Structures are given as C-alpha cells and as structure tokens.
C-alpha cells in the first residue's frame, strides 16, 4: 500500500486532474514531491490519488514508483 507515502519525482510525470465533468492532463515537473492520498486499490492496482501542491491528481502507480524516489514526509506525517 502506498497511501501516506511521499515521492520525489526524478522525471516529469503525467497526472490527471478531475474538475467537475472534465479531466485535464497535468505535467508534474521533475523535482516535485507528491503525496499518495489513496491507492492503489485491490480492484484497480494501476492508479493512485496524489496531492501535488494544491491539486489532487490521479497518477499511474508504476509511473510514480519508477520515476520517483520515496522520501520522508513532513514532520509528524512520516
């Protein structure tokens, strides 16, 4: 389970932001940290919900793990 973990992205990585009925591709640049909020779920092992800055995105779990490096979270959060 990746929930609660933080990853420093070493390469630009694509995420999807869902706003109402619309989905928008968002490129998260290398050097940014994403926090896994949820996932992957047993019925969908491919996607995770992440927080990046003030956005909530859906990303491919494999992309986050292969293009990122797990780092400690903010103090008190792991």
Feature locations, PLM:
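Beta-loop motif signature
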Residues: 1-42
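SH3/SH3-like beta-barrel superfamily modules
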Residues: 32-61
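Boundary regions of SH3-family modules and the immediately adjacent low-complexity/disordered segments
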Residues: 51-78
């Amino acid at each position: 389970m990746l929930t609660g973990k933080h990853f420093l992205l070493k390469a630009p990585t694509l995420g999807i932001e869902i706003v109402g009925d619309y989905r928008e591709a968002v490129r998260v640049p290398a050097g940014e940290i994403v926090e896994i909020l949820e996932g992957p779920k047993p019925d969908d092992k491919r996607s995770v919900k992440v927080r990046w800055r003030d956005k909530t995105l859906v990303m491919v779990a494999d992309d986050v793990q292969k293009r990122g490096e797990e780092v400690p979270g903010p103090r008190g959060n792991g």
